[in-house]
Amino acid sequence: PRRGKYHQLTFSMDYFYRELYLLPFSHDETVHGKKTILDKLYGTYEEKFAQCRALYTYMFTHPGKKLNFMGNELGHFREWDESRELDWELLRYPAHDSFFRFFRELANLYLTSPALCEKEYNSACFRWLPTDSAEQETGGVYAYRRTAGGQTLVTVLNFSAEPLEGMKLGCADRTVLHEILNSDDVRWGGSGVTNPAPLVSFPIPCHGSPSTVRLHLAPLSAAVFALSGSPAAEQGKAWTVSGGRYMTV
């Protein structure tokens, strides 16, 4: 079970800065009876896709370069076979088409966000963030911050089967978080539990941080937030995405 294995996902950062790493989901893991990435995951048809979206969010927001074998983006159930082409016909089905579009959106976010693709080996640019969730160590709730190129992104992962309603996250004073990607968005085949309004911090200490923000996460989901520093500066301004750079307009 996933409970009790919390530190297996955090362990990678204990030795990350000693060498140069590639994060692979290669063909070796999807052949010879090992099942595809999607089919390895436990649960119903919908839960498999939800977990897969959360898994790839973790992969693309984790420091290090990525390697995904061809076909992973289709969410296929048949193992790779060198004697035939990929299962392109899967894109006719809504669940697979939604997953493909989510994968494309996630890859674009990675490629266009300095916080995700620059300074991976500068330890000052990555930090685990504590939460108040009782599920953190027993149910798989993770949060971390990536910073580079004048941009800060915060990723929150809920690998548990329980919803997180009003989860507290410690932060600096006068912090605003803007959700820029949520794996549970209905566009990607999710149930629609998102955080559409800016999350403004309030001055209640949380795990050593001077302020707190509250957010919601569906079971088996992940969200990425762009961080800004002044609620007053954000009043009356809408946020948009321009080539992956997040700016007020």
Which residues are covered by each model-predicted region?
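Aromatic- and carboxylate-lined catalytic core of secreted/periplasmic carbohydrate-active enzymes
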Residues: 90-127, 221-224
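C-terminal beta-strand-rich structural cap/linker in extracellular carbohydrate-active enzymes
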Residues: 196-239, 243-248
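Active-site rim elements
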Residues: 38-49, 87-97, 209-214
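Conserved alpha/beta catalytic core and glycan-binding cleft of carbohydrate-active enzymes
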Residues: 1-81, 111, 121, 126-169, ...
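Repeat-unit-sized solenoid/scaffold elements
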Residues: 49, 55, 94-102, 243-248
